[in-house]
Design a protein with these regions (language model features):
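Noncatalytic, helix-rich "gating/capping" subdomain that lines the substrate-entry/channel surface
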Residues: 91-383, 387
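Short, glycine/acidic-rich hinge or "gate" loops at secondary-structure transitions
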Residues: 69, 101-108, 219-229, 245-250, ...
């Protein structure tokens, strides 16, 4: 945990759009939101040469990245508005109330918020709140004791080399199961530990210095802690699967009996590890069976002081944002400034809102939904979703690379898609979480323990398919293959994605393309391996799967050729799922719009653009963004989403509809020869 956030202990197997959307035609300040601001256009660029800079160049010039951000785009603006205006208003109202009932949602929200703002108490307490965990580490004498201590600390979200979570069994998606796999890298992904380019080497150097500084601030006397932690994590990183390998749901499904864990890693007490975590199970689904043996050897060959220093570091970095300012500031310097290029921290008041949202998001979300998302909005979004479903079915029927047998199964899956809109139909009971106004660290521990225990209680029980993986105020959407569902929180249904006062072309290029994006995740490189019931089961003929893989591989190579920064090309294999979803979402939205206009008079030009052109302008405006080089490098190495510029421009050369809309010629950069275009869905 690099800032203060919830540690639910679950790795979400869902594909998110990473974008924001709002119910209504005005923003939080009641100012009208234009369908498309024509001042965003930069006519010094030609749409057929660089569509992003044509459509968004003006916006980029007039919207530099704020010092408190590493990226600034449409969904950052909406995220800020949701949290720092809407949630702020809700929290401010609550904190003025007297005699709040202990355990009530309002008491928990008010006191968590107050505990974050109580800087005097945080400074006075120093490291005292985390002392019990440090004493546990100090008492470790051998690997077996280290392993058990790591298990204890994992319950409150502190990272170690092996992570455990609960999710639907991919081969029996109606039942919950225990999953386990790799974890424990402070830099997030193994490429940071093995790339030899200058910028990545500098990150490692800065990381080593950061660990040294944090230990110095704590007055700990570990010898060379920065080098110790970096060296250990480098060894650990090289044992782990890459982010691309982790995308394979078949390769990463390895169910073993609990007894076999001892065979795979004989020096580690797995029964104790599971028991300490409160897990009662006879099997565990592993991401990578060989990883256990490699970790066993790494631990037994490492000096015990190295292991203690590593675990001590994990405790300190986990809670850094809740500790005195010197730790918080140094934590920000590395993880925000060095890693992402952010120049300054947000004001503490704003951070308090975000911390409360991150840890008590659902109780806050309940209040958010009541105030900002009328139930009537669900009907409109439901209609949009059904329109996309209809067009997707028509597109499947038109495919020339897929046989009738596979088309039949694809239709079954499409028909089985379910969806959630706005907010949950039922709310969890959080009243058992003890939240006080004067102990931020303990509040974090208590929320983490609640989330851990709530997850563990599901083991071996039927999946509750009404559960949400995002809060209502989240500016995002997702597809969950294990439920075969698409989910659109209330926070995502806002301009520029959905604007009731906009022309249809802008909305289809926005919200409808996002709905299509999430539907397409059900048929991307990962989602296509799950059947209509959410089970990891092949429903393709062998030849059709080969055809799909061939198309996907061509799209991978296409994105592999895009250089986002000097020396940093997009990883086509890592981003393929999102890239397929963008291409599919755009295609579905375009033909849904065309279908809606049949038999009607052609829409009038708006600002000199026809409906086809405004459709693509709608797509461009939801992704417009400025980003720091550091954040872009981080995204390229760790994120399954391509950079915003390439999400805009990337799919367009493959769409003949774009070429025709803008009257592009064969020599234009935004046009590919027909033989090089990739058309999947």
């Amino acid at each position: 945990m690099r800032d203060i956030k919830s540690t639910a202990g679950m790795w979400m197997r869902a594909s998110a759009v990473v974008a924001v959307l709002a119910a209504g035609q005005v923003n939080a300040q009641n100012k009208p939101v234009p369908a498309f601001d024509k001042s965003s256009i930069d006519n010094s660029f030609k749409p057929c040469q660089d569509f992003d800079n044509y459509a968004n160049g003006g916006w980029k010039k007039h919207n530099p990245i704020p010092g408190t951000e590493s990226r600034w785009g449409a969904f950052n603006v909406l995220d800020k508005e949701n949290k720092e205006v809407r949630l702020k208003g809700i929290i401010n109202t609550i904190t003025t109330k007297k005699n709040l009932v202990k355990g009530s949602e309002e008491q928990q929200i008010a006191d968590f918020y107050k505990s974050y703002l109580d800087v005097a108490t945080i400074e006075k307490l120093g490291l005292t709140p985390i002392q019990p965990y440090l004493l546990q580490i100090d008492a470790i004498n051998n690997v077996q004791e280290w392993w058990k201590t790591a298990a204890e600390l994992s319950k409150i979200g502190i990272t170690n080399i092996f992570g455990v979570y609960v999710d639907a069994d991919a081969l029996d998606s109606k039942m919950n199961a225990v999953y386990g796999g790799q974890d424990g890298l402070s830099l997030g992904e193994r490429s940071y530990y093995e790339r030899q380019d200058e910028s990545t080497q500098n990150v490692r150097k800065e990381f080593e210095q950061h660990v040294n500084k944090m230990f110095s601030l704590a007055n700990w006397k570990d010898a060379n802690p920065g080098k110790t932690v970096l060296d250990f994590e480098t060894k650990l990183a090289l044992l782990q699967l890459t982010n691309v390998e982790l995308r394979d749901p078949v390769k990463t499904y390895n169910k073993v009996g609990v007894g076999e864990l001892k065979t795979l890693a004989p020096d580690l007490d797995w029964l104790s590890y599971l028991s300490i975590n409160g897990i009662k199970t006879d099997s565990v689904i592993l991401q990578d069976k060989p990883y256990l043996g490699k970790v066993n050897n790494l631990l037994t060959s490492s000096d015990i002081n190295t292991l203690k220093t590593y675990l001590r570091w994990q405790v300190l970095t986990h809670f850094a944002g809740a500790l005195p300012a010197k730790f918080d500031t140094e934590n920000f310097h590395f993880f925000a400034t060095v890693m992402r290029g952010t120049k300054a921290q947000k004001p503490r008041l704003e951070r308090a809102i975000r911390a409360t949202d991150a840890n008590l998001g659902m109780p806050l979300g309940k209040l958010f939904a009541e105030k900002y998302f009328p139930s009537s909005s669900k009907a409109k979004v439901s209609e949009m979703i059904e329109n996309v479903r209809t067009v997707y079915g028509e597109r499947i029927d038109q495919l020339t690379w897929m046989s009738d047998a596979t088309k039949k199964e694809a239709h079954k899956k499409l028909a089985a898609f379910t969806y959630k809109i706005g907010y949950p139909d039922k709310w969890k009971d959080y009243s058992s979480i003890n939240i006080s106004a004067n102990n931020l660290v303990q509040n974090l521990v208590n929320t983490a323990l609640y989330n851990h225990n709530e997850a563990i209680a599901k083991v071996g029980k039927p999946v509750d398919k009404s559960e949400w993986l995002m809060t209502p105020q989240t500016v995002n959407a997702y597809y969950n293959p294990l439920n075969n569902e698409v989910v659109f929180p209330a926070g995502i249904l806002q301009p520029p994605f959905f604007n009731p006062n906009a022309d249809d072309a802008i909305n289809y290029g926005g919200i409808i393309a996002v709905i299509g994006h999430e539907f397409t995740h059900g048929f991307d490189d990962q989602g296509s391996q799950y059947d209509a019931n959410g089970n990891l089961q092949n429903w393709w003929t062998e030849s059709d799967r080969k055809n799909f893989d061939a198309l996907a591989n061509r799209y991978i190579e296409y994105f592999n050729g895009i250089e986002a920064l000097p020396g940093f090309k997009i990883n086509g294999a890592l981003t393929i799922g999102e890239n397929i979803a963008d291409l599919g979402g755009l295609t579905l939205a375009y033909y849904a719009l065309e279908k809606s206009l049949k038999g009607k008079p052609a829409p009038a030009l708006i600002d000199g653009h026809n409906w086809q052109q405004r459709f693509f302008l709608g797509w461009a405006q939801v992704w417009h963004a400025n980003i720091t080089d550091a954040a872009l490098r981080n995204q390229i190495q760790t994120d399954p989403h391509a950079p915003a510029r390439d999400r805009i421009n990337g799919p367009l050369p493959h769409l003949v509809e774009f070429e025709h809309a803008w009257k592009c010629g064969p020599s234009d950069k935004m046009v590919l020869p027909a033989a090089q275009r990739v058309v999947i869905w």
